[in-house]
Amino acid sequence: MIELLDKVRPSSSCLHVLFISYDGYTTNVPIEAVFSKQSLLATSLDGEPLPTKYGGPVRVVIPHLYAWKSAKYIKEIHFTDHLHLGYWEKRGYSNTADPWREERFIDKEVPGWRD
């Protein structure tokens, strides 16, 4: 991911990164998440192009956030200065998604989610 950021050079006003998948799935992460050395854009597996069943052609992997932030089938990446809620975030899931802080939902309990 660092190689991409070196080429793109997001502006200093960039606060968020929005990933858009071929299947319409979207997720947004804070810019700090993509600057993490743990984060990566996977394009291959064992020297071969990443198979669709594993999220190819491009999959973002951000292991220090909840799994819904690691989108598959990436077709677009937007660097933005404002928050765009992704698929799960529009449904009440946390935008920051830190599992160590148990940031699963925007509110600790989302009304109706157990129904």
Give residue ranges: language-model regions.
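Structured, non-membrane catalytic/scaffold regions adjacent to prosthetic-group chemistry
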Residues: 1-115
